[in-house]
Amino acid sequence: MFLQIVTSVLATGLLYALISVLQQNRTLSASLPPGPPGHWLFGNAPPRAFPYRHFAELTETYGPVFTLRFGRRIVCVIGRYQAAVDILMKHSAETSDRPRSVAANEIMSKGHRVLMTPAGERLKKYRRALHAFLQPSSSATYKPMQYKNAKNYVLDCLHDGRHHLYHGRKYAASVVMSVAYGKTTPTSYSDPEVLQINKSLARLGAALKPGAYLVDTYPILKYCPGYASHLRRYREEELALITKQANAVRELLAKGEAPPSFTAYLIENQERLGISDDELAYLSGAIFGAGSDTTAAALGIMTMAAACYPEAQARVQAQLDEVVGRDRAPTFEDEDLLPEVTAFVLEAYRWRPVSAGGFSHRATKDVVWNGYVIPAGAEIIGNHWAISRDPEVYPNPEDFKPARWLNEHGRIRNDLKFINFGFGRRVCVGQHVADQSLFINTALVLWAFRISQDAQCPIDTYAFTDTANVHPLPFSLHFEPRVKDMEAMLGAQAE
């Protein structure tokens, strides 16, 4: 009986898909941006690994925007800067929706994960809550905490440079746990709760990979008994964890002992914000998911670039010596006088973008671009990797050149941008906290050390994880101190 039900459901779904695909092929082929040919029914085969690199190759063949088909799904991939501005920025009102994500959002997240929440009132509610705590004026209040943890990061690299990537993860986790839950002590990346959170993030990233679950192409499979039961188990495990963390803050608030945090803000304003307990837990968890993973990866990329491009590193250090000297450590107050540091960070964002493949948008209305039509309902991917390699905007894009971000007066250019934090109304709300982290860590670590590669084990700058947010695979560095009495100046704050 069960087999008959499953067979009937699949047959109905395939018949519906066949009719829909044939209809789409007749009505849309002439107007869509070009793309590689695919199977008449199933469309294009999803890339098996590193989709952003595969899509970048297709950009070279088919142009700034190309079209793929996965069953009934139409996916338009953007690989050039101006096309991204035209479609995802200027048409933000029509392209800020998210495609339906059955596996990762509906099954794994109960529809509460802000990253995948469709455009509408719920998304506005979530973003209002996030913006209230992460806007520039609020983000500035985190600088003392970020500075303390950045000094710990430098001291960790001084004492144990071999595990520099781990120290970057520890920095990121400590900052994010402080912002999200008010934790005031450094957070080890081996803490049980952090390990559980990262396990959940890895599961989410796997579910978001193109073609990972057939249910995203044929949503009717969601209703097949037993289908994707492991995803439902993942959901319950994650919800139990983030609810436990939120409840711990509730208990501290009840005692009058809770330090300021995003979770405390949500609890105190829960009724006004109109959010349920589950929504509150997911919003708090989103801070860790969005901030820890990406910041840790960006710190690894920053040190990789410093080691691989010693001349660029030396330019930053020359300005640090001129502005700061070696008798004190740089601080946030020096930022306006250190454009070389900012340029180095901006180039690291571009050179190896953390969200390399970007996250899918969905058109709610037809979007006309250069004579082509991206139809309502189509998915739109801004491929950060390909956009970052647009030779018209970033000449010699494979080279690491922080100087491209500076004008003739040595100040940061206003006419050059890289959209590394997302597009339009989907831009990352936490970008100001992230920028603060990258600036102060870059300033401190390049002030403190001359970073170089291990001659016996040169760095492969293309060796990254195949995940939604990419991380450098382990690589060796030498941290040669540039400053005497570093510990005395920074203070022995490592715990």
From Swiss-Prot:
Pathway: Secondary metabolite biosynthesis. Disulfide bonds: none annotated. It is found in: Membrane. InterPro entries: Cyt_P450 (IPR001128), Cyt_P450_CS (IPR017972), Cyt_P450_E_grp-I (IPR002401), Cyt_P450_sf (IPR036396), Cytochrome_P450_fung (IPR050364). Glycans are attached at residues 25, 198. One of its GO terms (cellular component) is membrane. Heme binds at residue 428. It comes from the Eukaryota. GO terms for molecular function: heme binding; iron ion binding; monooxygenase activity; oxidoreductase activity, acting on paired donors, with incorporation or reduction of molecular oxygen. The keyword Coiled coil does not apply. Keywords: Glycoprotein, Heme, Iron, Membrane, Metal-binding, Monooxygenase, Oxidoreductase, Transmembrane, Transmembrane helix. It is a single-pass membrane protein. Its EC number is 1.-.-.-. Cytochrome P450 monooxygenase that is able to use 4-ethoxybenzoic acid as a substrate for oxidation. Belongs to the cytochrome P450 family. This is Cytochrome P450 monooxygenase 64.
